[in-house]
């Protein structure tokens, strides 16, 4: 897959409602200005932006554009997210010395470029990929191993570098596979304020740079982050930052990344709190922007601590400017962005993830098989909001088992959204196979699905669209899908969404459209009719599966929380049902391995954060 997106504009606005008949909300730029009361003052610019992994030149261009914007806002200190220069996560690119050296060279070039463009006096903090300068092996890694690093650029030079101290090695994170940890407590003195610097996990884990910031008597703790989205994580993040600010004893700024990378979504939601844990600024979710704050912070101490502090971290102090700025009047324009409710947040994450995957991989259009059911209808609505209805192509592929209402529901969806639509019956191909092979039962059912998959891939090859797979988490968990049939595609937008949430999101999307005076995109019949694959007469999903509320509750315990069979039964679920569902999950691992990537929105999706053997003799028993 090749291609490169167009250069990002300096202040893009989100477009969650692009598509026929859907008017996007008014664009807005995030510029928040706050004063706390006290001296000296510091205007901090937090650039909550997107990056594309591997596009070092494009990411550097973005840093320059947003630095220019920050300078226009009068910033005194500018910050960008974790590994913004390389994108995050870089995975095994970190093991390629050529990529590491390209990152290091780009950092030096960026420092010179910022100075050439007139921003040399403006200190810029950003993340990049570095390597250890140590001549000795460390933590079982050879000398010169990669580092997840941050840097301060000033006057055309790389003034200060530091590496992430706490390395996450859980869920989707494999940072111990790639990086060696940092052992310094970087403190930058700028305009008479000591600013302690941290990177993401340095806040999420106890110890390390948070207590070290207190020991160093910092006035501000600035953490640059690339922490992926999960449902309900925003509340956890807020409480974390509040707690760490109190532990550090200083104002704490948590700068987040925004955008998508393969299966991960970054939701923004940057936060600044005072030393007492009170929130003074919170940025929008899923939106690029620049948060500008006028902060009154404690003056740096003349005899500030030096040497080794908490967790063996050595204070690494760099003085840029001792003298405070002349007093100026701080303007308050607003500080707390509106929060999204749970359904809108989840839907927005799915839109951002899909849009990022399509655009960052150089595609401009998507192709979806439309059955008239709720899964393909929700995927179509997401696609219209992500890339615009004019770039969405839907194909209905009815068989002799397809109901009239399903065919009609697919056409109605196309009419409501304005997507491109065609109907191609599979009967001639199906009859040819049946005449040749005489298939019956499940083989006959799956043949229909595989013919549809073949047709979608043929159209994709001919017309250049990327195929979207409509499978949901409930179906993938129990293997209720057909390999090389409904599982074909390059991306699965609802791969990590349980069926019960599919219904809720569809209802929310329609309700949101109605509240805006727009046409609800999803036909009501697609939401209310019993789910069915329609591969045999009268078929409905509950012929093969428990009711979805029960199924999803069992799956949430087994898949998301790793509960055993005894624990699930003790929670009130029938032992025979639990045994059956768990066996279906275990024996479907080989199918899930062949499913395309898709947006991760839960704490544990079917991807890097759930790794089980295919050949596996272990079975849960009650």
Where do the protein language model's features map onto the residues?
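ATP/NTP-dependent adenylation/nucleotidyl-transfer catalytic domains that generate, transfer
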Residues: 40, 249-250, 275, 299-371, ...
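Enzyme catalytic cores with a strong preference for nitrogen-chemistry domains
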Residues: 28-369, 385-386, 421
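Ala/Thr-enriched low-complexity intrinsically disordered regions
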Residues: 2, 7, 11, 20-23, ...
């Amino acid at each position: 897959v090749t291609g490169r997106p167009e250069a990002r504009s300096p202040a893009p606005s989100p477009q969650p409602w692009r598509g026929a008949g859907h008017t996007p909300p008014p664009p807005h730029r995030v510029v928040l200005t706050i004063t706390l009361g006290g001296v000296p003052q510091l205007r901090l610019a937090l650039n909550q932006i997107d990056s594309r992994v591997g596009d070092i030149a494009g990411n550097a261009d973005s840093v320059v554009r947003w630095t220019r914007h920050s300078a226009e806002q009068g910033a005194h200190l500018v910050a960008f997210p974790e590994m913004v220069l390389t994108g995050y996560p870089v995975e095994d690119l970190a093991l390629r010395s050529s990529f590491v050296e390209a990152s290091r060279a780009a950092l030096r070039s960026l420092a010179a470029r910022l100075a050439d463009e007139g921003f040399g006096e403006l200190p810029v903090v950003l993340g990049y990929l570095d390597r250890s300068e140590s001549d000795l092996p460390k933590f079982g890694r050879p000398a010169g191993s990669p580092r997840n690093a941050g840097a301060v650029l000033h006057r055309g030079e790389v003034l200060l570098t530091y590496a992430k101290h706490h390395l996450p090695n859980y869920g989707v994170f494999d940072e111990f596979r790639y990086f060696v940890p940092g052992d310094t407590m970087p403190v930058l003195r700028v305009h008479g304020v000591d600013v302690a610097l941290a990177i993401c996990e340095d806040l999420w884990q106890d110890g390390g740079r948070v207590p070290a910031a207190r020991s160093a008597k910092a006035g501000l703790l600035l953490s640059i982050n690339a922490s992926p989205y999960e449902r309900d994580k925003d509340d956890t993040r807020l409480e974390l930052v509040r707690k760490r600010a109190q532990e550090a004893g200083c104002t704490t700024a948590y700068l987040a990344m925004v955008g998508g990378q393969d299966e991960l979504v970054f939701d923004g939601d940057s936060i600044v709190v005072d030393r007492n844990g009170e929130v003074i600024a919170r940025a929008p979710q899923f939106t690029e922007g620049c948060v500008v704050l006028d902060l009154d912070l404690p003056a740096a101490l003349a005899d500030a601590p030096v040497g080794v502090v908490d967790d063996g971290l050595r204070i690494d102090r760099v003085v840029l400017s001792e003298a405070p700025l002349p007093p100026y009047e701080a303007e308050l324009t607003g500080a707390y962005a509106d929060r999204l409710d749970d359904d809108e947040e989840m839907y927005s994450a799915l839109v951002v993830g899909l849009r990022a995957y399509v655009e960052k991989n150089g595609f401009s259009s998507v192709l979806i098989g439309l059955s008239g059911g709720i899964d393909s209808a929700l995927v179509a609505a997401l696609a219209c909001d992500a890339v615009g209805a004019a770039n969405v192509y839907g194909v209905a592929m009815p068989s002799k088992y397809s109901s009239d209402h399903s065919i009609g529901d697919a056409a109605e969806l196309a009419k409501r959204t304005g997507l491109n639509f065609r109907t191609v019956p599979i009967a001639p191909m199906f009859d040819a196979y049946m005449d040749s092979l005489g298939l019956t039962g499940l083989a006959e059912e799956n043949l229909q699905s595989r013919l549809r998959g073949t047709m979608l891939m043929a159209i994709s090859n001919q017309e250049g669209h990327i195929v979207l797979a409509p499978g949901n988490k409930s179906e993938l968990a129990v293997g209720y899908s057909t390999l090389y049939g409904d599982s074909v595609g390059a991306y699965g937008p609802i791969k990590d969404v349980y069926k019960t949430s599919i219904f809720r999101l569809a209802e929310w999307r329609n309700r949101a459209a109605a509240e805006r005076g727009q046409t609800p995109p999803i036909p009501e019949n697609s939401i209310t009719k019993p789910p069915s694959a329609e591969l045999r007469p009268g078929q409905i999903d509950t012929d093969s599966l428990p009711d979805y509320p029960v199924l999803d509750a069992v799956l949430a315990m087994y898949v998301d929380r790793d509960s055993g069979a005894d624990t699930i039964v003790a929670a009130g679920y029938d032992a025979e049902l639990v045994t059956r569902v768990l066996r279906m999950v275990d024996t479907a691992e080989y199918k899930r391995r062949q499913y395309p990537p898709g947006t991760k929105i839960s704490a544990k999706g079917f991807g890097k954060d759930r790794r089980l053997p295919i050949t596996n003799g272990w079975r849960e028993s009650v």
